[in-house]
Amino acid sequence: MAETKVAPNLTGIEQTKAGQSFTEKLSAEAMEFFCNVAKLPFSQQAVHFLNAYWAEVSKEAEFIYSVGWETIKYADMHCKGIQLVFKYDEGNDLDFDIALYFYEQLCKFCEDPKNKNYATTYPISQPQMLTALKRKQELREKVDVNFDGRVSFLEYLLYQYKDFANPADFCTRSMNHDEHPEIKKARLALEEVNKRIRAYEEEKARLTEESKIPGVKGLGATNMLAQIDSGPLKEQLNFALISAEAAVRTASKKYGGAAYSGGAGDAGAGSSAGAIWWMNRDLEEKKKRYGPQKK
């Protein structure tokens, strides 16, 4: 993310919204916290948002995961010229031009007749169609909270759900709440699964290309490709999935929907419900794609 530039004595957000909100100024400490969250990968930004607003936004979590998150990753891949998912390192923000593309793809998805159930099931998640000129104005004047000329997933989420969310309130709800050790362990276990998926997919792609070569080399690659699902890379992936499932299960039993203040007696209670939901949903997706297939 580009270096955040804040004008002297202007740590607030010069935006307008019904009620208190985007006009409320952020303290220097709150702005620093906000910028730090916005530097995290898209998925971790989403978890921070869901933790803060779980009571209000839990019914929209699936849209945020399967549509919002997938679309912003797709836009980031498009920007970076990456076509294969396993080669993608999750980003944290988009410049305004790619943010326009993100919104364009989001609107296109929601307007597609085959996705009409998303409109009825997740009404407050539906993006507003705007011209490119108007959208860029909105991005500059209303979405870009920290004035860095870029759009993070957190900024998109706060603006999309502005009827109940805003930057100042987000910071108030989220600051001084550490990630619980068991939740961190589960998150890192899922990141290990991602590493194993990448190693597996890279080898699979290499063998697929090599199998197209005529002669002995191509035949050898074809044979290795046929055995890849019983090879060491798949075994390592299976082990990582099992370990992640155990870690997520432990975190879910201990802290599903519970509060955690990191031992700070006067810090208040920070919900972990969003993190627990996200990890379970992510694990479900990984198991569906790479876990043992039912016969």
From Swiss-Prot:
InterPro entries cross-referenced by the UniProt entry: Calcium-reg_actin-bundling, F_actin_bund_C
GO molecular function ontology, one term from the record: actin filament binding
Domain of life: Eukaryota
Pfam families (UniProt xref): F_actin_bund_C
One Gene Ontology CC term in the entry: pseudopodium
Example GO BP: actin filament bundle assembly
Function as written in the Swiss-Prot or TrEMBL entry: May contribute to the structure and reorganization of filopodia and pseudopodia accompanying cell movements.
Subunit record text: Monomer.
Protein name: Calcium-regulated actin-bundling protein
GN (gene name): abpB
